């Protein structure tokens, strides 16, 4: 743009020619219409006192004034804090550069100070006297004395009051108008007075404009720029061209005055005319001025929003909430209605009634907090909505809406269009470029054009104008060059050219500290470099830099290193450490391993002077530097939240739920609710921690540096409840993963957020949070519920511990163990001592449970604990103890099971199948099912001589038994060497305790621990064979047992209340035990239970029915086990126990002898009722009458009965003689068939007996029942297709048939009748 033009109209001899001393970088096109007023503080700086006054004055930057003809004018005021005097010389060239007003503000406490303030004000008037129209002085004096104000408070204030100007007087040479206020005065009328001051400036300006407009064209003088005075010396000013030059320049000057006086339309016309006139004579400098004036006047109408409140000068560290310089690109395309307003036929704007007698004063929201800041900070005019009212004797000051919004008609036809403004600015700049003394004006024009193009959304034009500024050759100081770069930076930022803005900002920073500078300003350099972060896609928060990962790493690293150097030169070691930490945190992945190592060492050296901490740093100018953390140094590979040890983990106390109503099921899935719940509990840990209990988090770390990395004071980072974290110190080897356990104690209850950990490495304290760790699938945090404190206990037992703990489930809760060895049937006890180790919590809840590797039923027989005794000792106070006694009984199966071979060898009618035996099977000590086997039938054993002699011995009188050795297979039984129950058995069990107390008990939490029991059971005694024999009385029977001593010691066996026997080690003996027979009531109850269960099975369509014989056999087995207890004692020791007959298997003949017969016998011999053991005597040849009466005392009828009578002689040596045809004769049948014997029915049979020889005879009277032969089984009638009919048929069969129809039974009259026959 800047063409090389050879012709220079501005040349001259030596000497410094007048020029603008410096550009006004804050100028905009709209400032052409403003009245320039100097606002200056005088006297000592009292920022807190005068700040309010400065704000009030600066608010009045726009007024509405009615001119002499009644038309409203919009007058704008521009307050500046400083104005070079030589700029007034350019007032003819551009009138807005002329200072027209002066306002000073000062504070005094005495007359001397007031005089000094007046003197300073007058000196300013003299300095700018050539252009100054009006001036005002605002003085703040001391407050009234307290004693003087008491009267005013107590009474009404005086009409006039004591005025400050009455106490203090201004010097006589002070001619300016002064306003006096007390220090605490609210200055309510100050804005109104400043409005009057602005109005006065307007009228003076208006008079000058009118004077200029009335000048005759032939009498006007030539207006000159300061450097042009020598160019026109000796020229003929009456020439045609010079006359046109004079008229054109005056016309341009009048246009400037009209623009300031609010006559924008007139100014446009004048600028156009002046431009044509001056262009015709080749007056390039002033042609450029008219073109710039046209642009300014058009911009006032097109872009009134440029007068609105400008952006506050915010502190660079205070970013807007929720925004980030890396996330939001500065607004490049701002909305503008400029082009719309040109083409629109009617403008739609917010109109304000101009007849309202109010004055709109606009506020300037400045960030200045002191008078001194006003001296160093440029002032900008802006709009506000604070209205005040004022009156004037010469004009009416009305409400002043923002001009351009009050548009009653279309825009003027001669206004420049939007695209023409930038073209006219180009022309103006080209014209200015022809004059080297106009370089400052050229620079300002380029800046104004840039701001207009920003409003027009023309970033390329903005960049072109700004680039042209760099080529303008200006003689300026380094400070001015820095200022120029800063302004260019700001404009580039407004159009979104962040990198260009950052380049110039960094260039300005380097200018402050360039080589050769006598006073390098590192503070300003640091500030500017910090401000250039945005352009390089950096921000002060390292987390956002890492998250966005934008920009150019090489440039970013270089910038941060330069910033570190500046911080070091400032002597701010903490700041240098912070930036070096920032560099390592954000650029770690962009560095080579060598650079990483070098930077780490450099950080270590910097932190040696001042260690880094994870807290924000606040600089002197208010900039906040966020904390930087070495999140990946060391590198966290994994982090796991550990549960408490198993015996300390909290568990819920199970409470039986009350029935709250019917259970409702729906297949509908509420997906949104499910997703919300999953998202909510995504980071929730499944277990809980306990208040005041040490908790653990395991971290796996890796050192990425090539040297050892010491890490000290490593702690957990938490949020939520109070958590006391314990420090950890370690040294990490290079590139070696290392596990670290971090511990801490929650002090309160509630939710605990585990956010990460803190480290102290390389001299920097860092908070390493999980959410900031990149490249790992860590959640933002872990949420752990902390429940109330639980008591802790220690457990000891009175038994020795085992070498190894239990292998059962939940073995991790075992805290101690106990081992015990018992013989089968032996009892013992174990005392468990529980100590409450809590310092404050009582043990209020204690419950136990036992788990073992045996079935529950057997377990309950082995282990017993008195629960009521435990409850009686609760609660246990802190440091108190409670003793729990565990009774242990070595439960075992003492009845020897029969091998499978004997199951098939038994041919008795009462043989059982495997299915029937399962109904009363027992469990062995090893935990596996052991089905008791049925022994051989007694009928077979009776044929053996040994058994025969044994029975005879029992029936003959008290037995004389001797110990006998049992061999495998001998005696019809099974030898001890083949018994599986003779081997040692091992039982593992756990006694588990759940305990709680305090608030945790109320919340429903407890702990669980266990004691492991290792119980070894040794074989003691075993029942190898058994039989049932009739006793001397009908109400009893003899249970004959073969008992083996499986121990290695002699054993004393107590098998009745009064009878004992000694058994040698590994020997056996046979003992008879009298037992009461099972009552008929129990048999009847068993029959009823069997019928009910079979009926239930039929209703449930079960085909397998129960057999009454099985139920009766089981009943008899249980009857024997309940009544027979064999006590044993190992001689010479205190080891003793009890052997039970649980699981004994009985054949059908044994069952008939065990249970009470369903027949009631009444036998008479010679009309005398036979009683047991009664002696019956008769003579040889005498006919004796034998009467037998049977009664069915069962609840079922009996069928197919056969009553038989046999006489025999017992030789008492095991031999019985039934061949007595020559010795006894029976008159009548000795076998009588009874087809049916109903319940409670009686049958009687009578016969006569004649004995032919004397002797002792016995009569065997028995009744047998034979199984009923049926073509079709009753069960076959019960079909699934017809359950109702099957039920009725089944019931009829069950209740109509007797239980003897399925088995053969033999019921004898016990004992046999003994008859002694004597000679006559």
Swiss-Prot record:
Subcellular location: Cytoplasm; Golgi apparatus
GO cellular component annotations of the record: acroblast; cytoplasm; Golgi apparatus; trans-Golgi network; TRAPP complex; TRAPPII protein complex
Bias (Basic and acidic residues) ranges: 329-340
Purpose of the protein: Cooperates with Rab11 and fwd/PI4K to mediate the flow of membrane through the Golgi, which is required to support cleavage furrow ingression, therefore promoting cytokinesis in male meiotic cells.
Oligomeric and partner information: May be part of the multisubunit TRAPP (transport protein particle) complex.
Domain of life: Eukaryota
UniProt-recorded name of the protein: Protein brunelleschi
Residues with the Phosphoserine modification: 317, 672
Keyword terms of this UniProt record: Cytoplasm, Golgi apparatus, Phosphoprotein
Disruption phenotype: Failure of both actomyosin ring constriction and furrow ingression in male meiotic cells.
Main location: cytoplasm
Gene assigned in the entry: brun
Coiled-coil intervals: none
Annotated Polar residues bias: 314-327, 345-361, 945-954
Record keyword Cytoplasm present: yes
UniProt biased composition (Low complexity): 362-400
Region (Disordered) location: 313-411, 923-954
């Amino acid at each position: 743009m800047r063409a090389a033009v050879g012709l220079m109209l501005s040349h001259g001899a030596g000497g410094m020619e007048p020029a603008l001393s410096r550009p006004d970088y804050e100028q905009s096109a709209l400032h052409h219409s403003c009245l320039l007023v100097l606002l200056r503080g005088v006297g000592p700086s009292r920022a807190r006192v005068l700040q309010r006054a400065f704000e009030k004055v600066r608010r009045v930057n726009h007024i509405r004034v009615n001119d002499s003809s009644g038309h409203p004018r919009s007058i704008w005021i521009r307050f500046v804090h400083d104005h070079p005097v030589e700029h007034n010389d350019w007032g003819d060239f551009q009138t807005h550069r002329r200072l027209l007003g002066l306002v000073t503000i000062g504070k005094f406490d005495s007359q001397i100070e007031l005089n000094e303030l007046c003197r300073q004000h007058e000196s300013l008037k003299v300095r700018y006297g050539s252009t100054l129209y009006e001036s005002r002085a605002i003085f703040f004096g001391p407050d009234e004395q307290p004693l003087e104000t008491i009267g005013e408070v107590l009474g009404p204030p005086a009409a006039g009051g004591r005025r400050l100007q009455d106490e203090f007087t201004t010097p006589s040479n002070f001619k300016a108008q002064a306003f006096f206020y007390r220090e605490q005065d609210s200055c309510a009328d100050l804005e109104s007075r400043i409005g009057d001051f602005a109005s006065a400036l307007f009228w003076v300006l208006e008079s000058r404009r009118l004077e200029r407009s009335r000048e005759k064209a032939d009498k006007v003088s030539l207006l000159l720029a300061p450097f042009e005075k020598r160019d026109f010396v000796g020229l003929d000013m009456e020439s045609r061209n010079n006359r046109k030059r004079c008229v054109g320049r005056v016309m341009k000057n009048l246009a400037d005055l009209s623009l300031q006086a609010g006559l924008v339309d007139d100014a446009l016309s004048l600028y156009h005319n002046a431009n044509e006139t001056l262009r015709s004579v080749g007056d390039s400098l002033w042609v450029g001025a008219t073109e710039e004036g046209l642009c300014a006047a058009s911009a006032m109408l097109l872009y009134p929003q440029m007068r609105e409140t400008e952006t506050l000068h915010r502190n660079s560290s205070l970013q807007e909430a929720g925004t980030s310089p890396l996330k939001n690109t500065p607004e490049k395309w701002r909305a503008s209605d400029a082009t719309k307003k040109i083409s629109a036929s009617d403008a739609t704007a917010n109109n304000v009634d101009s007849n309202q007698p109010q004055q709109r004063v606009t506020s300037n929201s400045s960030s200045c907090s002191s008078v001194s800041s006003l001296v160093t900070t440029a002032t900008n005019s802006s709009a506000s909505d604070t209205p005040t009212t004022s009156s004037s004797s010469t004009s009416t000051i009305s409400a002043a809406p923002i001009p351009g919004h009050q548009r009653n008609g279309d825009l003027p036809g001669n206004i420049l269009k939007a695209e023409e403004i930038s073209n006219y600015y180009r022309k103006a700049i080209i014209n200015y470029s022809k004059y080297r003394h106009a370089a400052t004006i050229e620079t300002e024009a380029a800046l104004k054009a840039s701001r207009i193009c920003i409003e027009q959304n023309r970033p390329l034009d903005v960049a072109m104008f700004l680039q042209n500024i760099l080529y303008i050759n200006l003689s300026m100081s380094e400070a001015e060059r820095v200022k120029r770069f800063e302004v260019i930076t700001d404009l580039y930022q407004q159009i979104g050219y962040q990198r260009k803005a950052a380049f110039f900002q960094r260039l300005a920073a380097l200018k402050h500290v360039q080589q050769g500078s006598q006073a390098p300003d590192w503070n300003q350099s640091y500030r500017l470099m910090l401000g250039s972060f945005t352009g390089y896609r950096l921000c002060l928060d390292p987390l956002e830099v890492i998250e966005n990962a934008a920009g150019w790493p090489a440039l970013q690293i270089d910038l941060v290193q330069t910033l570190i150097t500046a911080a070091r030169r400032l002597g701010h070691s903490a700041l240098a450490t912070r930036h070096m930490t920032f560099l390592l945190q954000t650029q770690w992945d962009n560095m080579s391993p060598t650079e990483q190592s070098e930077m780490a060492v450099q950080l270590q050296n910097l932190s040696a002077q001042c260690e880094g901490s994870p807290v924000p740093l606040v600089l002197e100018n208010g900039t906040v530097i966020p904390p930087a953390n070495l999140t990946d140094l060391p590198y966290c590979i994994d982090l796991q939240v550990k549960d408490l040890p198993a015996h300390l983990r909290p568990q819920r106390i199970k409470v039986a739920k009350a029935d709250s109503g019917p259970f409702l099921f729906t297949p509908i899935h509420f997906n949104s609710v499910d997703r919300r719940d999953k998202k909510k509990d995504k980071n929730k840990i499944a277990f809980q921690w306990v208040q005041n209990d040490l908790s653990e988090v395991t971290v796996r770390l890796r050192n990425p540096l090539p040297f050892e990395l010491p890490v000290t004071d490593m702690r957990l980072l938490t949020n939520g409840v109070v958590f006391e974290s314990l420090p950890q110190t370690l040294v990490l080897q290079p590139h070696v993963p290392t596990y670290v356990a971090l511990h801490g104690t929650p002090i309160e209850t509630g939710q605990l957020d585990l956010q990460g950990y803190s480290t102290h490495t390389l001299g920097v304290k860092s908070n390493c949070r999980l959410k900031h760790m990149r490249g790992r699938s860590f959640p933002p945090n872990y949420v752990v519920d902390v429940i109330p404190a639980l008591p802790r206990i220690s457990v000891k037992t009175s038994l020795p511990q085992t070498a190894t703990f239990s292998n059962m489930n939940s073995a991790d809760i075992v805290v101690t163990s106990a081992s015990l060895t018992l013989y089968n049937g032996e009892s013992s006890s174990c005392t468990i001592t529980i100590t409450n180790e809590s310092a404050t919590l009582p043990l209020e809840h204690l419950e136990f449970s036992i788990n073992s590797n045996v079935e529950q039923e057997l377990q309950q027989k082995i282990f017993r604990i008195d629960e009521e005794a435990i409850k009686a000792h609760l609660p246990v106070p802190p440091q108190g103890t409670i003793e729990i006694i565990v009774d242990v009984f070595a439960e075992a199966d003492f009845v020897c099971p029969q091998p499978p071979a004997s199951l098939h060898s038994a041919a008795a009618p009462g043989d059982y199948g495997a299915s029937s035996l399962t109904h009363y099977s027992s469990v062995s000590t090893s935990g596996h099912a052991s089905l008791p086997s049925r022994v051989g039938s007694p009928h077979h054993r009776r044929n053996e001589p040994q058994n025969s002699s044994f029975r005879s011995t029992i029936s003959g009188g008290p037995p004389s038994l001797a110990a006998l050795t049992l061999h495998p297979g001998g005696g019809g039984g099974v030898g001890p060497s083949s018994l599986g129950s003779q081997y040692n058995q091992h039982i593992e069990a756990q006694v588990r305790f759940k305990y709680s107390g305090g608030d945790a008990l109320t919340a429903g939490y407890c702990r669980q621990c266990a004691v492991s029991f290792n119980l070894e059971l040794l074989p003691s005694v075993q029942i190898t064979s058994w039989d049932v024999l009739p006793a001397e009385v009908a109400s009893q029977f003899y249970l004959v047992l073969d008992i083996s001593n499986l121990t290695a010691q002699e054993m004393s066996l107590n098998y009745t209340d009064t009878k004992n026997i000694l058994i040698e080690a590994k020997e056996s003996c046979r003992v008879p035990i009298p037992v009461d027979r099972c009552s008929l009531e129990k048999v009847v109850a068993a029959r009823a239970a069997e019928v009910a269960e079979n009926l239930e099975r039929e209703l449930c369509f079960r085909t397998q029915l129960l057999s009454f014989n099985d139920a009766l056999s089981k009943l008899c087995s249980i009857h024997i086990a309940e009544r027979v207890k064999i006590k044993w004692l190992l001689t010479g020791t205190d080891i003793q126990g009890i052997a039970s007959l649980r699981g004994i298997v009985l054949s059908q003949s044994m069952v008939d002898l065990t249970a009470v017969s369903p027949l009631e016998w009444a036998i008479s011999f010679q009309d005398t009722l036979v009683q047991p053991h009664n002696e019956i005597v008769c003579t040889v040849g005498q006919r004796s009458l034998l009467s037998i009466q049977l009664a069915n005392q069962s609840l079922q009828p009996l069928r197919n009965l056969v009553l038989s009578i046999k006489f025999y002689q017992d030789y008492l040596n095991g031999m019985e003689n039934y061949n007595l045809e020559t010795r006894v004769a029976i008159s009548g049948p000795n076998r009588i068939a009874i087809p049916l014997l109903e319940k409670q029915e009686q049958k009687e049979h009578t016969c006569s007996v004649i004995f032919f020889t004397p002797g002792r005879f016995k009569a065997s009277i028995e009744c047998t029942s034979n199984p009923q032969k049926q073509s079709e089984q009753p069960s076959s009638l019960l079909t699934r297709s017809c359950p109702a009919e099957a039920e009725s048929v089944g019931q009829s069969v069950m209740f109509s048939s007797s239980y003897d129809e399925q088995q053969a039974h033999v019921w004898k009259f016990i004992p046999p009748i003994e008859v002694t026959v004597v000679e006559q």
